[in-house]
């Protein structure tokens, strides 16, 4: 009865207070407007997974501590300028993704984070490796916790419960035995700051851990589901006219209610298990298996032989017009006329209703991804004298089926499954069918249309590491290689590429990525110095190995591995009241490949551009420190000074999408341009702790951040069309984003209610200065061609960016028992 009353009291208290935790729910599209190709870039982890919901009050002495990493996430502050995919997590010897890591942490597993490459022999990461601890090291202990929050950011209400239960042998707790874990979380409601953003999500996970004398077993099963209305980047012109830095162009009013055209859904059942056994006195066996099937969907507003419905399209902005027309459009935007600034759902329904054939001109479509993954790893760990060997093999495969589904015809009866972009093309207008295998090309709601294909990969990874110690020196080396096959299978036969050119299995691509890593460490007294070098060859993304995977089996002409050279030197000092770490790092990549699918304004064609020979370099200095000034006061600091740049000019081969004829071979002037992450970031805080109270104030600062550059607009081909130096410089120019600083404060108190029960309350205020911080920004691939007399002006499209949330307040409550 007591526990029930505590549950009820906490729920009531939490629902009366606002609280926020999760990072900005951004949706960064490369180019969402009236283009034939639309590629989602889900690089922001916050799109697909929430952050850890535990109270973070204890700074840790590592490069970029949880406090500083969380605070600096207010802007897109990539660690060492790397993509998030470079952060790896290990469960045993198997690399798992962020969702799996989040599940195991939610179930109570402890983790050990190692920044940089000093412990990347198995993960291959140039960023950060997180080891998920198992068995006795997992630090599982019996407890339960209940957590509820009222949040105005991304969602409104959230409740979760987690529990760890021991199964005691003979009725008494023992070091050996079973631990059972469960975790459940529910979030629902709309964002109070950004219109159209909402979340409905349920996470469920159960697990079991057995710790025996010679055996250890860990198994977890999870089922996260989510549905989220998303936010999308726009132009500075739109933000200025609407007087709203959180302007979101993806929604509009329908029947008096807000409707978002971009809704992401995800369902992912997963199981992961690891068994460890001591087979001899010096050898341990570890078997790991991981499998999941993820069903993703992302809706978008589509148009068929009709003008774009995107409200912030450049053709609908005041800057597109002149004289009287400009004044009218500017007035509509500045007065927030929803018929101009947002999607006009009523107009779309009306347009569909007057079509004599009943066919839709506008519809909401769903891009679906069914992703399956399986990995089976067998590893041995042997101790031979002073040397510890870790070696094994992993068989793994991934399959991603991509297709489009008609979600809502907006009052119409059907569409035809044809390529609307070549209907008026003199050469290809008779080859419009998207699927010759379906003679009846009528598409109703719920039908697949447009494209349907699968990308598959299978590989066998072989790995080995060795570690040994000599006096004050530690040495480690590691190597791995993974021969793999990649192929495409088309389920639609597109008329443009009839037969095996689009239908059935493509030729297989055979690649063998590999990595070697060597490190040494010297320790004496309170000082520790380490040096690490890593060389790697990595496989490109599967969709960058095909010209147009949606409906074409053609492989790019030169599929090759990207090469990586990474090194770092780290120094750390540990004393009773002071800890510090400093690192010098370098990461250089070459021979990267990317396929850009876009509308080429010079050719007037939808095109596939194969960009090869991309080279990037990232180097810098980072440092962290923690000082205990007294019994009650402490501080932590983090600093990163870096350069993130392109160091090579890539080759660009541009092909027509309709027939893969080479339009141009050119070079892009990318050398010297910035990659697009803050190159200076600072964090500092001061914290007070006493008798269950904690108060902390922190300052964050970002500088030298640039808009992510476009390769296509800097090609020699585009620059040759300019009529003046001013036009050339405008295309070459890379915008620097404003430097930003924020101040956060946090206040928490833990109450001990009984011997086994405690209550925690934490108040936080983020960005109390109310600073306008650019969260992320990127350049468009398209250019504008305008005829002025006898000349043609060539200008770039406006950059697209999104802003972080303004001043935010939150209150969280947690109960442990």
Which residues does each PLM region occupy?
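Transmembrane beta-barrel wall of Gram-negative outer-membrane proteins
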Residues: 155-231, 263-281
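Gram-negative outer-membrane beta-barrel transporters
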Residues: 469-472, 584-588, 606-713, 816
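Outer-membrane beta-barrel signature, preferentially recognizing the C-terminal barrel domain
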Residues: 247-270, 274, 506-515, 519, ...
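A beta-strand signature from Gram-negative outer-membrane beta-barrel systems
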Residues: 58-60, 94-169, 176-177
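Surface-exposed extracellular loop regions of Gram-negative outer-membrane beta-barrel proteins
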Residues: 234, 438-442, 485-496, 522-567, ...
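Acidic/polar loop-and-plug regions of large Gram-negative outer-membrane beta-barrel proteins
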Residues: 217-274, 297-365, 428-443, 595-597
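C-terminal beta-signal and adjacent terminal beta-strands/loops
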Residues: 4, 25-33, 701-720, 747-817
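Signature of Gram-negative outer-membrane beta-barrel scaffolds
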Residues: 363, 388-524, 549
């Amino acid at each position: 009865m007591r526990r029930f009353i505590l549950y009820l009291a906490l729920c009531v208290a939490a629902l009366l207070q606002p609280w926020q935790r999760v990072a900005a729910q951004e949706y960064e599209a490369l180019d969402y407007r009236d283009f034939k190709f639309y590629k989602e870039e889900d690089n922001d982890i916050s799109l697909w997974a929430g952050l850890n919901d535990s109270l973070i009050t204890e700074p840790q002495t590592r490069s970029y501590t949880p406090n500083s990493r969380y605070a600096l996430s207010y802007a897109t502050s990539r660690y060492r300028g790397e993509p998030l995919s470079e952060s790896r997590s290990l469960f045993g010897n198997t690399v798992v993704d962020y969702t799996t890591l989040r599940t195991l942490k939610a179930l109570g597993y402890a983790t050990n984070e190692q920044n940089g490459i000093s412990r990347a022999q198995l993960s291959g990461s140039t960023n950060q490796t997180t080891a998920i601890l198992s068995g006795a090291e997992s630090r599982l202990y019996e407890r339960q916790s209940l957590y509820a929050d009222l949040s105005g950011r991304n969602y409104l209400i959230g409740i979760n419960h987690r529990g760890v239960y021991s199964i005691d042998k003979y009725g008494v707790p023992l070091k050996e035995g079973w631990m059972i874990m469960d975790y459940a979380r529910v979030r629902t409601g709309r964002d109070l700051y950004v219109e159209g953003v909402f979340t409905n999500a349920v996470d469920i996970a159960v697990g079991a851990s057995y710790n025996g004398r010679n055996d250890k077993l860990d198994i977890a099963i999870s089922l996260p589901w989510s549905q989220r209305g998303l936010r999308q980047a726009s132009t500075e012109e739109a933000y200025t006219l609407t007087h709203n830095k959180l302007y979101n162009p993806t929604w509009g009013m329908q029947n008096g209610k807000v409707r978002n055209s971009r809704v992401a859904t995800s369902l992912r059942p997963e199981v992961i298990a690891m068994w460890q056994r001591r087979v001899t006195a010096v050898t341990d066996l570890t078997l790991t298996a991981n499998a999941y099937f993820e069903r993703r969907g992302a809706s978008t507003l589509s148009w068929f032989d009709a003008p774009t419905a995107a409200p912030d399209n450049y053709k609908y902005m005041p800057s597109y017009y002149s004289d009287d027309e400009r004044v009218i459009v500017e007035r509509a935007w500045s007065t927030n006329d929803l018929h101009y600034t947002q999607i006009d759902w009523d107009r779309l329904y009306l347009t569909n209703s007057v079509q004599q054939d009943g066919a839709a001109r506008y519809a909401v479509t769903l891009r679906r991804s069914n992703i399956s993954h399986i990995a089976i790893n067998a590893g041995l760990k042997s101790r031979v004298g002073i040397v510890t060997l870790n070696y094994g093999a992993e068989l793994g495969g991934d399959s991603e089926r991509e297709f489009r589904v008609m979600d809502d015809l907006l009052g119409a009866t059907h569409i035809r499954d044809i390529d609307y972009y070549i209907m008026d093309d003199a050469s290809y207008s008779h080859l419009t069918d998207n699927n010759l295998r379906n003679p009846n090309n009528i598409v109703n709601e719920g039908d697949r249309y447009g494209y349907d294909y699968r990308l598959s990969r299978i590989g066998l990874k072989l790995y080995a590491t060795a570690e040994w110690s000599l006096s004050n020196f530690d040495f480690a080396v590691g190597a791995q290689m993974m021969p793999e096959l990649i192929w495409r299978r088309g389920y639609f036969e597109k008329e443009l590429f009839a037969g095996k050119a689009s239908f059935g299995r493509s030729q297989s691509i055979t690649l063998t990525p590999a990595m070697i890593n060597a490190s040494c460490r010297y320790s004496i007294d309170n000082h520790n110095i380490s040096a690490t070098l890593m060389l790697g060859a990595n496989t490109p993304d599967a969709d960058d190995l095909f010209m147009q995977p949606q409906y074409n089996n053609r492989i790019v002409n030169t599929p090759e591995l990207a090469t990586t050279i990474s090194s770092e030197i780290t120094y750390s000092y540990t004393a009773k009241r002071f800890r510090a770490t400093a690192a010098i790092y370098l990461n250089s990549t070459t021979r990267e490949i990317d396929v850009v699918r876009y509308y080429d304004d010079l050719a007037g064609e939808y095109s596939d551009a194969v960009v090869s020979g991309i080279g990037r370099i990232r180097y810098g200095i980072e440092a962290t420190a923690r000082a205990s000034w007294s019994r009650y006061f402490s501080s932590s600091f983090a600093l990163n000074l870096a350069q993130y740049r392109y160091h090579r000019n890539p080759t660009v081969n541009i092909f027509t999408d309709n027939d893969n004829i080479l339009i141009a071979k050119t070079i892009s002037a990318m050398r010297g341009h910035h990659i697009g992450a803050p190159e200076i970031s600072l964090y500092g805080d001061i914290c007070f702790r006493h008798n269950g109270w904690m108060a902390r104030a922190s300052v964050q600062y970002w500088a030298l951040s640039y808009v992510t550059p476009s390769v296509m607009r800097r090609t020699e081909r585009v620059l040759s069309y300019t009529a003046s130096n001013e036009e050339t410089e405008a295309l070459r120019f890379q915008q620097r984003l404003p430097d930003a600083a924020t101040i956060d404060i946090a206040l928490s108190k833990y109450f001990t209610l009984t011997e086994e029960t405690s209550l925690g309350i934490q108040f936080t205020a983020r960005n109390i200065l109310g600073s306008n911080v650019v969260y992320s920004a990127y350049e468009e691939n398209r250019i504008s061609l305008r005829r002025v007399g006898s000349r043609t002006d060539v200008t770039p499209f406006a950059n697209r960016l999104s802003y972080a949330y303004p001043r935010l307040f939150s209150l969280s409550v947690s109960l442990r028992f």
